[in-house]
Amino acid sequence: MIDILRDSKTIAVVGFSSRESRAGYYVPAYLQQQGYQIIPVNPYLEGEPLGETPYPDLQSVPVPVDLALIFQRSENVPPFVDDAIEIGANAIWMQLGIRRDAAAAKAKAAGLQVVMDRCALVEHRRLRAQQVL
């Protein structure tokens, strides 16, 4: 987890939400404030959330993605993991409450680092407080 947060620069947020009260918005907003490049991924987004161009899917993202941060129901995760593998992402992070063991195993077998059922905001703050990041 430390390596993922330390080494990632570009984070594609699958399931980015335009609602500020949802974790799919405020977690990436926090990460952007910490210096990460955030790429919203959601086919239904309009405008430029957080000042960034949104993309309908991971394959449409025109830059290399270090981390695919997933805000989707657990049962919906497998195709996003497949997409992350296909585009050459370095890691998959399934947000708090999201776990899909078979998809995680597939990602690991493809060489990706995987985090499941953890909040990226909480973990980033915790690691910063420990002066690890």
What are these regions (language model features)?
Residues Q34-Y36, I87-A91, A110-L112:
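A short helix->loop->beta-strand "cap" motif at the edges of active sites that frequently abuts
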